[in-house]
Amino acid sequence: MANRPLFKRKKFCRFTAEGIKHIDYKDIDLLKDFVSENGRIIPARITGTRAYYQRQLNLAIERARFLALLPYTDQH
């Protein structure tokens, strides 16, 4: 039998639950939760983020990368 978890956690949108209306590119601690170890943006199907907030999240991460607040890739 495959190594499946006993139960599947229900995905929920963190931004809707916490009442966050706008995602700021300067909030690095929040953005790091949605970037993988190798620097890629984690998709909404894994995080459970709504499409509206996922678009804001992508834009905020791209802006933070451009301003060198977040790395583009991992530390080799």
Swiss-Prot record:
Keyword Zinc-finger: no
Any Pfam family hit: Ribosomal_S18
Domain of life according to the entry: Bacteria
One GO CC annotation: cytosolic small ribosomal subunit
InterPro entries: Ribosomal_bS18, Ribosomal_bS18_CS, Ribosomal_bS18_sf
Function: Binds as a heterodimer with protein bS6 to the central domain of the 16S rRNA, where it helps stabilize the platform of the 30S subunit.
Protein name: Small ribosomal subunit protein bS18
Species annotation: Nitrosomonas europaea (strain ATCC 19718 / CIP 103999 / KCTC 2705 / NBRC 14298)
